[in-house]
UniProtKB/Swiss-Prot annotation:
One of its GO terms (biological process) is signal transduction. This is Casein kinase II subunit beta-2. One of its GO terms (molecular function) is protein kinase regulator activity. Phosphorylated by alpha subunit. Keywords: Phosphoprotein. Tetramer composed of two alpha chains, one beta chain and one beta' chain. SMART domains: CK_II_beta.
Amino acid sequence: MSRKNLIKLNHDPTVTYSTKDDADELFDDLSSSPLHENVSWISWFCSRPGREYFVEVKEDFIEDLFNLTGLNLAVPFYNEALDLILDRTAPDTLENFDMDVIETSAQILYGLIHQRYIITRTGLHQMAEKYSMGIFGCCPRVNCCYTHVLPAGLSDIVGKMPVMLFCPNCLDLYAPSSSRYKNIDGSFFGATFPHLFFESYPELNPKRSIPCGKIYQPRIYGFKVSELSKTGPRMQWLRMYLEDSGSDSESESD
């Protein structure tokens, strides 16, 4: 089987990694598999360049088959991939398989497991540590004052969209600036994660800690450009917040 046909899923993705270059960037250095190294597959995967967004999923989470419900239908060579992730596979037992294919399936499977893991209490805590350290980067918008961002997906299905970065200050999505992250699938983080994260860790929400919700106001010779103008500002309400939502809710209840 050729490298360009490595990823073959049961659904019909709109975005696939169909070229050799794309496959090489996403699944780099397959030949350096941990099968012959004194390191777990999970640690090896997360330590590779470009995998900084990922956390190490606990093996007991993966061994609980309830957490893997339905993934056998989404990943080819599911059993072999799962054995590889859990280091239950010896090199000589895979002689009849194309190791590139098994490695690719294992990485897809791990990504989908990762999506489910990071919305658990333990997974959220691990991601919170990375977020606090700024591992995921900062918002490129000037008025967001270097607010830390979180990885997010637009879909929970593999192959739909690459990973994006969600800014909790301007509530917008941005593509990663580094090319090493452009082929990470968005489903490996999912659409739920960033919003559940800030519900679980409200103290990390920048809207509650730093006053950086500025909105750019276009001006000509010092005068504000009207919103009715063709070149005027658009949809500024998207970045406007209530000063004290708590007091508003109390007044409504009265």
